Structure formats: C-alpha cells, structure tokens
Design a protein with these regions (language model features):
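Signature of extracytoplasmic/envelope-associated structural regions
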Residues: 1-44, 48, 58-82, 86-538
Length: 538
C-alpha cells in the first residue's frame, strides 16, 4: 500500500503583493452559459477580497470564477463568498494580481459530485509557477495547520458534576516554522526585513522604455518597441531601488509576458533593457513586511498525482528569523515564527457536518518546484570585520531578527475566526558570536580589541556612535553575500545613525584552549547585498 512519506514532500513559497493574495496564475474550462460579470468601473488591486462588477448574472455563492482572459491579461480563480447584485463579488480569499477595469470575470466548470475537481485546471498560457521557490536545503517544517481554540464553559447549578457544561469555538491561529535550512541563494533573506531590488549587467540587446504604468501584481505589460526582445531572455525594468529583473516568457507585438509578477509599481516611460549575470540584489528595510505564501505537497510513495495532499497557507509574514554559522559548517537560516491569515487545501468533503468550514479549494494545483543548483555559503568562505578590525578566529555567530508580529482578530463576517490582519511591532536586531582571542599583544599596544570596545561602550571621539560590522561570504567571482551594519555602512552619533554596541564580551576561564570570548551585540538596522547568477528574486 502507498503511504505518505516525509522524504517525498515538496515545499515551496512565493511572495504576496497584497496581504493574503497568493499568486496562483491558473485557468480552467469556462462555463459558456455562466459569464458571471465584467469588471468595468474600477481596477482590482492585489489583496482585495471584493471586486466591482457591472453585473452578477448567474453568480452563485460557493462557485468559482476566473478573473482575466487566458493568455491575454493574466488569470486567477477565486471562490465566491457573497455578492451584491449588479455591484460586486466578494471572495473567500484575496486576489493576488492587478486587474484592469474591463477584465472579464467568467464562471468555470467544476465537478463536485465525488471528486471536487475543476475541469481543465492548469497554469495560464504565458507564465510560470509563481509559488515555485524553495528557501534552501531544508529538512523539517513545523507546518502552520490551524490551531483551534475550543473553550470549555462551566455554569453554576446545571448538575454537571464539576465537569464543563459546554464547549465553544474560539479563534483559530496558524503559525509555522522552517528551521535551520542551508542558504543556497538570497531568496529567503528579505522576508523578515523588507524589499528587494535587482539589477543586471546590460546585455547590449533589447533597449526600450515602458509604455504605460506597470502596477505591482502585473506579469504582462507594454513597451514602446519589442525589437531585440526574445523569450527566455531577462529584462530589467526601472533602475536603482525600484529595479526588478524578470524572465521573458512571451513577446506579442509590443506586449511582454514575464515569468513572475512585478512586486513594485513602475512609472510610464521608465527604462527597460535586457540584462545578463551577474545580478545584484539589494535588500532594504521596510515598515511593512512582505507577505508570503507557503505550499506543501505530500506525495505518496507510489507518486500517484491524484493522491497528492496539497496545503496552501497565505497571508503570512516572517516574524522572527536567525542567520547562523559555525566552524566547519555552512551559513544557515531559520524562519522561527511565521503566522498566517488562513489556508486552503485539496481534500474534498461534501458532508453536511464538515464541508462549511473545511477550507477546501478546487483550484489547488501542484507546482514544479525550482531547486537551486548552487553550493551553500561555507563558513570558511566568510569574513567578519568589526570597528575596522577583521577577526580571523570566529568560531560561530548568530544574527537574530524579531519583528514582534501581532495577529489581530477584528469583527468580520467570516465564520472561520482566523486573524483579520497581522501587524508589525518594534523591530529588534542582535548578534552573538564566539571569537577565539588573537595572538597575544603587549599591554601597551594600541590595537582595538573586544575587551577595549566593551569598555568603550561605542562612545568615541565622534560621540556615541557605535561601530560598523561587515560580514561577507564569497563563493567565487561575482558571487557574494554582504551584510552591513548600520545599513548605510557609516556609524554616526544621533538618532537613526548609530551602529553596533557590545553589551557583553565575557572571556571566561575554562578547560578549552585557546581562550575565547562570548560576545553579545545590539544594533539598530542592517542592509544585505547579494551578488549571484539568480536573476529573479521572489
């Protein structure tokens, strides 16, 4: 008999542009007799649960509609939760993409007798899986399946013999953990921090400008001239902090489809040109963290596709994360805390008892997971500099990031009692390290040491500035990962300017030799720059 094996699980993730708007560019067989509506009066933005329409003919709560025309303007499918006749449709999950005014909303065929399947469900014509990314070489996942708060109530005088009288449903929470995975590229780094911009080296081909605004959530757009643009090449749109690189999937006249939606808005007439490696990815802080979706596919031992158990978690944020490495090992990361707004899955159930709130979604589709072929970042390839001094004998280090996320539960019409939103609290950074002491020096030497810096408390001639930290991993030519503290690389006195401070640096006496110091460091911000051959970062 076939069984579900943990070593046959596929895990992948994708970014979200609007909270809860998972990116699933799917299409299905249209129901010719059921054109539900047409969006005409407004655009529909990523993260919206409700879209405006000019009609709701044949709209039925619980049925599915495809938003967008296959191979033309990008498509996705959502389930109708409610509607206002002739005005709007509200879905069970937020939409993931940007949709122009006038986009067709079409009912799609489903088979709900026993299988709960959707007829003709597949990827949209001119794109790729948008939830295809893997964070690295991982081994275990604490899956964010819902935790149900069932609350017993004790009433006086009901003859319950000290037992609770009745149990009531409370809130649902979803939180997962992906621990101790080896970094193979910089994909997962931005999610506990903020945004990413990507630039490439100009290839000398395909130079043009954008024709019309590109909105976050689009994966098709117009340019003034498509001359020199070829499918499977890479295109950079915009420059500086707004630059994004995407793979060209299809070119039709001056219209271009790319492999992944844009995460940022881009103004009309900005530059777009074909680029090649190396690519430089700059990760900078943002007040609001990027959203993230996870998908887990449990395959059985016979690898029978119809037995795949798919679970998709959306509306997530990475609340706590660590970066760690130790001698003889590799650079590893953990997403320590990842709360989500909700989930769906492909386990069909039409029973009256469980179907109303079981989170089934017929649009669940297995993705082809993209697995990097790059080497890890080895500890031996790293270097750490603090207060201008490179430390050659670092035994281990850990960088901690805490966003103090708080899921909130507001009044809503949903019966699921899941979080309404997840808000960021104060951001906290810290770093710990074990550093073997350098060769002995005369007590009169002027060399800066951990002990001296501890006593200095970051207070120098220029004021209470703290100090800089530079952490660099070099895998090869044009292949580096650089973490800089503070984010602009220059510590200075005053608010929003300081660098790092040593809170403790204990050099204890033990049986281990040579002597080492356990360092605890506080800092207020950082920036990360990754140079590699990966063009598209989620």
């Amino acid at each position: 008999l076939a069984v579900y094996r943990n070593d046959q699980v596929d895990f992948s993730f994708g970014a979200e542009i609007g909270a809860g708007g998972y990116l699933a560019p799917v299409k299905a067989t249209a129901d010719a007799s059921s054109e539900v509506a047409q969006v005409t009066d407004t655009v529909s933005l990523p993260g919206a649960r409700t879209i405006g329409v000019d009609a709701t003919t044949n709209a039925v709560v619980g049925e599915y509609v495809q938003i967008g025309t296959t191979g033309t303007d990008g498509t996705e499918i959502r389930r109708i939760k409610s509607f206002v006749a002739g005005v709007s449709l509200t879905f069970t999950a937020p939409i993931g993409y940007y949709h122009r005014s006038g986009v067709v909303v079409q009912g799609v065929e489903t088979t709900t007798g026993t299988a709960g399947t959707m007829t003709g469900l597949t990827l949209d014509t001119n794109t790729m899986d948008h939830m295809r990314f893997t964070p690295g070489a991982w081994e275990s996942i604490e899956v964010p399946d819902p935790t149900m708060e069932i609350e017993p109530r004790y009433f006086l005088g009901v003859g319950a013999k000290r037992n609770y009288y009745s149990a009531y449903k409370g809130q649902q929470s979803l939180s997962g953990t992906l621990s101790n995975f080896e970094l193979l590229n910089g994909y997962p780094l931005r999610f506990p921090i903020g945004t990413v911009s990507t630039t490439g080296a100009d290839s000398g081909a395909g130079g043009s400008t954008v024709d019309g605004i590109i909105y976050a959530g689009q994966y098709e757009f117009d340019i003034t001239s498509a001359s020199g643009y070829v499918a499977d090449d890479y295109i950079q749109v915009d420059v500086g902090a707004l630059a994004e690189v995407r793979k060209i999937v299809a070119v039709s006249s001056n219209n271009i489809f790319v492999d992944y939606p844009f995460l940022l808005d881009h103004a009309d007439d900005v530059a777009c040109n074909e680029v090649v490696a190396p690519y430089i990815h700059t990760i900078t802080e943002a007040v609001e963290l990027p959203g993230i979706s996870w998908q887990i596919n449990n395959k059985d031992s016979s690898e029978t596709a119809t037995n795949d158990w798919l679970r998709r978690y959306y509306g997530g944020k990475i609340g706590q994360a660590t970066l760690t490495a130790e001698e003889g090992g590799t650079l590893r990361m953990s997403w320590e805390s990842a709360p989500f707004l909700n989930m769906d899955h492909n386990q069909y159930d039409d029973t009256v008892q469980t179907a109303p709130g079981n989170k089934f979604d017929a649009t669940s589709l297995a993705v082809t997971v993209e697995r990097p072929s790059t080497e890890p970042y080895y500890f031996s390839q790293g270097s750490i500099s603090m207060f201008g001094v490179e430390f050659a004998r670092v035994a281990n280090f850990t960088i901690n990031i805490n966003n103090n996320l708080e899921p909130r539960y507001f009044i809503s019409s949903t019966a699921e009692r899941t979080p309404s939103a997840i808000f960021e609290g104060r951001r906290e950074y810290s770093m710990t390290a074990t550093i073997v002491l350098p060769d002995s020096l005369a007590s009169t030497a002027t060399t800066r040491t951990l002990f001296k810096e501890l006593l200095a408390e970051g207070d120098y001639a220029a004021g209470f500035t703290g100090f800089d930290i530079d952490l660099v991993f070099t895998r090869g030519a044009n292949d580096t990962l650089t973490i800089t503290v503070p984010s602009d690389g220059t510590s200075a006195a005053g608010g929003n300017e300081q660098g790092a401070f040593i809170r403790s640096a204990n050099t204890s006496v033990s049986t281990e030799n040579p002597a080492s110091t356990e360092v605890d460091i506080l800092f207020r911000d950082l920036s990360i720059v990754v140079k590699d051959s990966e063009p598209v970062y989620p």
